[in-house]
A protein has these predicted regions:
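Signature of N-terminal electron-transfer/Fe-S-associated modules in redox systems
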Residues: 1-156
Length: 156
């Protein structure tokens, strides 16, 4: 089973997940709060309750992939892969939302924090895990100043 290492600040937690598990579901099951709002109230209240609950529309579950991007579901599916995904949903073999890649790309496109970091940012609700990876939850970004366009992350 794949191992996912979640990093939040100085905290690190490693969990084993079945292959194909949606990253957001794995984090929630492990007790990791992935939804983030820039202005938080009392222990993550806004992030916990005011989000799209895994449909890929709000962008609050954005994560930074620091290792293992090749083991995550792709951002783009071929027509055949999309058709197979739809058939599997109809048969109850796959969960809707596991690979809504157009929605993921659109949501990340709207977010300032992903500008210049497109290769590292993913929405945890839109990513299926197929191998070991390291994920930074609620990554901090310099959204102003002279270092805005720097790319210090390993996937670039």
């Amino acid at each position: 089973m794949p191992k996912v290492v979640f990093i939040r600040g100085k905290d690190k937690q490693e969990v084993e997940v079945p292959e194909g598990t949606v990253l957001r579901d794995a984090a929630i099951k492990a007790g990791i709060q992935v939804n983030y709002f820039p202005v938080e109230l009392g222990n993550g209240f806004l992030g916990r309750y005011l989000n799209c609950h895994g449909f890929g529309h709000c962008g609050t579950c954005k994560v930074l992939v620091t290792k293992g991007m090749e083991y995550l579901s792709p951002k783009k599916l071929s027509a055949e892969e999309w058709q197979k995904h739809r058939e599997n949903i109809d048969k109850g073999l796959e969960k809707p939302g596991a690979q809504r890649t157009f929605t993921e790309k659109l949501t990340l496109w709207r977010m300032f924090s992903s500008i210049g970091h497109e290769g590292e940012m993913r929405l945890s609700c839109q990513v299926a895990v197929h191998g070991d990876c390291t994920i930074e939850v609620n990554p901090s970004f310099n959204l102003d100043g002279e270092n805005f366009w720097q790319k210090p992350y390993p996937n670039k």
